[in-house]
């Protein structure tokens, strides 16, 4: 993958990233003030895609910027295709619901599926398409995002003000 300790900025060209493990494009150690990295601080980072054609196939998160992921057309309209994990949403089936209620004077219904079997796997990997701890900001672009978990994820704010998303 691509990792920028301060930041990652793509403003044109064609970028193809494929990883079997880890994030496709990542930045996690930068504080940005007035469009420049002013100080490298642990746990901070910006990924800015301002143009170009970007294709990411990642074993974990597709694009991850701790502080922000910014997608804008300040250079040219970007085209972005991201596949995180297998690209197929992770779903699970329910275990059945409650049975019906008995009529007047009847008995309460029984659980529709009384098999309390459970299969659980613990996997700490994050398989999100575009992720930030603070801000995902989409102003423009053509985005095609497929992921096992959230396509767009932020612990604080996801902002859309343009773009075509599939």
PLM region spans:
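A composition-driven surface/loop motif
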Residues: 1-166
């Amino acid at each position: 993958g691509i990792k920028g300790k301060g930041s990652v900025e793509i403003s044109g060209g064609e970028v193809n990233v494929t990883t079997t493990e880890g994030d496709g494009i990542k930045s996690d150690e930068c504080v940005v003030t007035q469009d420049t990295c002013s100080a490298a601080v642990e746990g901070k980072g910006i990924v800015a895609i301002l143009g170009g054609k970007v294709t990411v196939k990642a074993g974990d998160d597709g694009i991850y910027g701790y502080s922000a992921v910014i997608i804008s057309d300040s250079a040219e309209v970007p085209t972005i295709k991201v596949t995180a994990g297998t690209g197929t949403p992770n779903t699970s089936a329910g275990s059945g619901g409650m049975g019906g209620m008995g009529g007047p004077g009847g008995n309460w219904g029984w659980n529709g599926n009384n098999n309390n079997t459970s299969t659980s796997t613990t996997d700490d990997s994050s398989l999100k398409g575009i992720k930030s701890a603070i801000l995902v900001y989409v102003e423009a672009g053509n985005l095609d995002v497929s992921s096992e978990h959230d396509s767009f994820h932020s612990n604080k704010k996801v902002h859309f003000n343009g773009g075509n998303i599939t």
